[in-house]
Amino acid sequence: MDQDAFILKEDSEVEREAPGGRESLSDVIGFLDAVLSSEPTDIGGDRSWLHNTINTPQGPGSAHRAKSEGEGEVSTPSTQDNRSGEESRVSGRTSKPEAEAHAGNLDKQNIHRAFGGRTGTNSVSQDLGDGGDSGILENPPNERGYPRSGIEDENREMAAHPDKRGEDQAEGLPEEVRGGTSLPDEGEGGASNNGRSMEPGSSHSARVTGVLVIPSPELEEAVLRRNKRRPTNSGSKPLTPATVPGTRSPPLNRYNSTGSPPGKPPSTQDEHINSGDTPAVRVKDRKPPIGTRSVSDCPANGRPIHPGLETDSTKKGA
């Protein structure tokens, strides 16, 4: 402390001038022990006793007493300033708890007013959850007369009549989301969910979703016939005869599947038959046996010849 340092400095100067400095030093040490052993709560009390002169025996220590009295008068303004600063610090320390207590009282008053305006004097115990009713009405009356929204009225109606939802489901009516805004109906081109789903309506047409159809046997056969027309190997050429542009193939006779005109024997060369329903297959006609002649299916007169009437030219002379 500054005062202790001032006293030590004073004592050192006294020891230099007075021969009985040892006695004064012992007195100072005893004084310091008394100061250090004092309780810290006495700091804000009266400290005027610190500035009193130390009574020393008469004789050589008279100069010490005179000098201490003179210097004590000079140093009184500084000690008064220190005392005022310490008192202000102590008052500041004591004012902090008082300010905190005052703020706490204000908070308690505000809480009491807030809860007292709603539920009464016992609102704090009710809102803290004492196991009883909180005092808040589930369906408060419309005291101010403000118009309620349709969603709120609908929710209250559903709460009052819980069987209405079951009746809607039994009648097949769409059940809308209670308390939510219904999604816009996009008409024929969009998905009209009428609030049954929270997903946004798709922009594509709903008719496109019916493309997948269960295949019928006729459809499967048509697909198989179409696949048979295509060549199995990409490198192989189809076996159909090449057609020259500008020429027309002769029409097939309904009596002759080989395409040869009536009255002529069938061709012995290889021919290709490619119908619309069967794949291209090479068919090779066999030559007629020796001694027989081919007879057309239908001669010029339109009467078929019985096979038993044919005669062998090798057995009978012509």
Swiss-Prot record:
The modification Phosphoserine is found at S68, S125, S192, S249, S257, S260. Residues 50-59, 191-206 have a biased composition (Polar residues). Residues 1-23, 38-318 are annotated as: Disordered. Residues 7-20, 83-101, 150-168 have a biased composition (Basic and acidic residues). The keyword Magnesium does not apply. Keywords: Phosphoprotein. The P/V/C gene has two overlapping open reading frames. One encodes the P/V/W proteins and the other the C/Y proteins. This is Protein W. It comes from Sendai virus (strain Fushimi) (SeV). The lineage of its organism: Viruses, Riboviria, Orthornavirae, Negarnaviricota, Haploviricotina. The gene is P/V/C.
